[in-house]
Amino acid sequence: MAEIYYDNDADLSIIQGKKVAVIGYGSQGHAHAQNLRDSGVEVVIGLKDGSKSTPKAEEAGFRVLSAAEAAQWADVVVILAPDQVQRTLYADDIRANLEAGNALVFGHGFNIRFGYIEAPEGVDVIMVAPKGPGHTVRREYEAGRGVPVIVAVEKDATGAAWPLVLSYAKGIGGLRAGGIKTTFTEETETDLFGEQAVLCGGVSQLVQYGFETLTEAGYQPQVAYFEVLHELKLIVDLMWEGGIAKQRWSVSDTAEYGDYVSGPRVIGPHVKENMKAVLSDIQDGTFAKRFIADQDAGAPEFLALRVKGEQHPIEATGRELRKLFAWNASNDDDYVDGEVAR
């Protein structure tokens, strides 16, 4: 059974007694910084010169420094930049400004798990990873609630890393909902697997194949879109509320029976074997090496795959349909970069 921590398990005064630098002011960065500040913690923001986030952070009342200056000032350095830029940011601006007794905080274990970042002697390495986007982390905190968090300690150089990680998690509101104890390895490998095999890669491919199957059989693209993509939210919401059992309880008997007899025909044992291969590539570092090598080369594979995905017929159909509904009219205008949700 997982070990779960709550507010009563943490001493907020620990993080209140630290100077915290949040490196990055995107979705997670703004939530961590604002929640910590509202919990009585002294926080500065570290950003590169010319960052588009600087005006936002300053408008929110934060002092903005360079990443190097912020790291030098702080006792606790929170790295919330995208995975692919963390190691360069760390090497160029952060590492030389760390000293014994400091702590590095991560929101995801990628760079530690795969060895792209290595902390110097005497520096704690901890993780607090909210299981929700930053705007939800902030909204729930303001409402007196919290988003569950994953907490881990990779390196306890000071002997006080666990009290610190729990105090930090309490400071952002995570222990109101609960903090699940894990390791950097478990968080990284399961997170990447979930994204690739189910939540992003698996679902995206399933939806595209479903759309193609219907349209190639002569059905209208608009009808196909509703059946395989639009209604997915209704099903996922039910699963989120009460698991697969509630989803099956809520749908018609026809849909439930079709679930049992046709689901295994589509997602058969061969899919599970493919999932195992995906997990193996994550565990042995194959995926990480491929991703970082592509990013270092300017992301040619990544960008080509993005363009290919955007050109799938389901995207044009979706844009056409979403314009018809007032409650959905602006949903195609509220994102720009792939990192917006992180």
UniProtKB/Swiss-Prot annotation:
**Binding positions (Mg(2+) 1):** D191, E195
Q: Which residue numbers delimit the KARI N-terminal Rossmann domain? A: 2-182
Q: What is the name of the protein in this document?
A: Ketol-acid reductoisomerase (NADP(+))
Q: What class of enzyme is it?
A: oxidoreductase
**GO annotations of cellular component type:** cytosol
Which residues bind substrate per the record? S252
- Give the annotated active site: H108
Q: Which UniProt keywords apply?
A: Amino-acid biosynthesis, Branched-chain amino acid biosynthesis, Magnesium, Metal-binding, NADP, Oxidoreductase
Its catalytic activity? Answer: (2R)-2,3-dihydroxy-3-methylbutanoate + NADP(+) = (2S)-2-acetolactate + NADPH + H(+); (2R,3R)-2,3-dihydroxy-3-methylpentanoate + NADP(+) = (S)-2-ethyl-2-hydroxy-3-oxobutanoate + NADPH + H(+)
What residue intervals traverse the membrane?
A: none
Q: Which cofactor does it need?
A: Mg(2+)
Binding of Mg(2+) 2: at which residues? D191, E227, E231
The family annotation for this protein states: Belongs to the ketol-acid reductoisomerase family.
| Any GO MF annotation of the entry | ketol-acid reductoisomerase activity
Task: Cite the cofactor comment.
Answer: Binds 2 magnesium ions per subunit.
**Organism, scientific name:** Leifsonia xyli subsp. xyli (strain CTCB07)
Q: Which Pfam families match?
A: KARI_C, KARI_N
